[in-house]
Amino acid sequence: MNDLSRTLAFAPMSSPPSARAPATDPVYLDHAASTPMLAEAVAAMTEQLVRTGNPSSLHASGRAARRVVEESRERIAAAIGARPAEVVFTSGGTESDNLAVKGLFWARRDEDPRRTRILSTAVEHHAVLDPLHWLAEHEGAGVELLPVDSLARLDVEALRAAVERDGSSVALVSVMWANNEVGTIQPMADVVEVAHAHGIPVHTDAVQAVGQVPVDFAASGLDLLTLTAHKVGGPYGVGALVVRRELALAPLQHGGGQERDVRSGTLDAPAIAGFATAVELAVKRQAKHFDRICALRNDLVERVLAQVPDAAMNGDPLCAVDHRLPGNAHLTFPGCEGDSLLMLLDARGIACSTGSACSAGVPQPSHVLLAMGRDEEQARSSLRFSLGHTTTTSDVDALVEAIGPVVERARAAGVVGGAGSAARKAAG
């Protein structure tokens, strides 16, 4: 028995967590921000945490860790229709998006200095938008954010026109597979067709899509795809960028070159093991999950609208694999500040979101809703309820019971435009 095993064997253990007690446990409706880890992923990760070995080392412990990494790479690739050599491990979705956007821009521009344009959409996650803005400011990139319709769906004809204006100057196209705020699924086949007709590579942020809708990298024709573990029931701090083998990328950071010489850093074998297990299970269960979660989502929307008749749902109303993510319910509540509603619901033990958790706390209206044509007041008056593998009918019941009084209280407090002290007063 090694020192760690001895410590674990004799350390006092707390009692295992009990089953849900609805009176005290929170109702978690924020799966789009992060979904609870699957028990199988926890077990896979825990099994490796008690083992020592750098995957880059040549001794037996290192080779064992390397075997875990490579087997995990193969499992993830098989689950999403990719080749193992195409899976580049990263620290998560944000790093993957940065590597895709910056790395591809630099590589393509180095090949041909005319390639300075990047085409994307106005509803991307900030993990794509912010690197684009950085490239525009520091590298002279010509970033063009293409319009979307009132459902947040890309105008493919606008993309076609932008490409045909001068396709030889476009370094890349980046369009998210599914929107993280309103759940709208983009017409990725059309995007790939338009871009590839001019030899332009396409990146997609599929963080919200993997495990929710069918994702097949090879069949999609995409060149780069971002995914992350904590959105599919895996651990935080690990993700991947899937890159076609023939595509060149410039690295963001330099060091050991562990991942195809485009990503350096010691690989986290335990987290990668948990990641692989989560991806496998999420993809395997996707079809059954879709039907169950769609039904719960539709029930939630119908009953919330019955409680608050002037509320409105944002995004594509159809729950289908080519229209909207199954667990996304994004609603505008007129006369209420979204942050205020969030705090009032949180005080009742219900967790939801006003949008992307990565930008939560920033007092700005949703850029996604603004791009969809909503005004600032509407963009500030919305909540996202996102359902996932732990969601039950009792969770929906709890929200439906709370939403009417919460909206009434928020409106009575007169909090529109002043979420800060007024929201805290309403919540208290």
Mark where each language-model region is.
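Pyridoxal 5′-phosphate
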Residues: 1-428
